[in-house]
Amino acid sequence: MIIISDTHLSVNRVSGTTPQSREDLRNYVFAEFDKLLDITDNNDDLVILGDLFDGFEVDPRDWLEAYRLLTAWCAYNSFHTLYLVAGNHDTSAKANRVSSFETMAAVLKGQFRNVKVIGIDETLTADGYIHLVAHHRNQELFDLTLAKVLEDCERGDYVLLHANYDNKFAEQADHSLNVSEAQALEFTKKGVTLIHAHEHQPRVEIPHGTPADGGSVVCLGNQIPTSV
């Protein structure tokens, strides 16, 4: 299984930019995304672990370009699965709004049999040992889900999620969820590895108290630099 995350397609930076530099950034991000998809061709299943797009609603031109690239991947990789996991950019406080990610996920799932969607507040277990956890609407719901996933985990399992790790500033911010060191320790003591998207800087952490044969916390970082 190959994991990419935080691609932030349709990124739009205003401060200190010009129309041309914004267009250049847009083209760069899509070119890099295309390269990432090419690398994964016919290699393995692909997980996009949140924040496919930079915003809740994106420019239709960018949506169509993302659709073109993803449909090509799904058609060419018919024996592999594309897992689309919702991130924090894919939800809104208004329940009647549908995000660009949700539209993309629904269209691709309806068109291809090898697409699976893990929407807001949802989880899915792949291959029996990989637990995918999407963004949740608030920290309380997220904590409840983590507790349930912990019960289901066995040694050697992986939990893929879109959240901060041990970030005190995010603990009370529902738009940016947090896994505390204490929560992570319960997983690593069981020999489970947590793989985080959302944080843009890569790092590997071992929660204090983890046994020598325990798991770890891996923050992937984003593969296409668009911001810190």
List each language-model region with its residue ranges.
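N-terminal active-site segment of His-dependent metallophosphoesterases
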Residues: M1-E65, L69, S78, L144-G156
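Beta-strand-turn-beta hairpins that frame and shape the catalytic cleft
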Residues: M1-I2, L9, E122-L132, C153-Y158, ...
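Active-site neighborhood of phospho(di)ester-bond hydrolases with catalytic His/Asp-centered motifs
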Residues: I4-S5, D45-D51, T81-N88, K116-I120, ...
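Active-site neighborhood of divalent metal-dependent phosphoester/pyrophosphate hydrolases
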Residues: T7-N12, N43-R61, H80-N96, D157, ...
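Metal-dependent catalytic neighborhoods of phosphoester/phosphodiester hydrolases
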Residues: S15, G50-L70, A86-G110, E171, ...
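An acidic, phosphate/nucleotide-engaging active-site surface
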Residues: N96-A147
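Active-site-proximal segments of metal-dependent phosphoesterases and phosphodiesterases across multiple
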Residues: R137-A147, E151-G191
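Conserved beta-sheet core of the metallophosphoesterase superfamily
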Residues: E171-V228
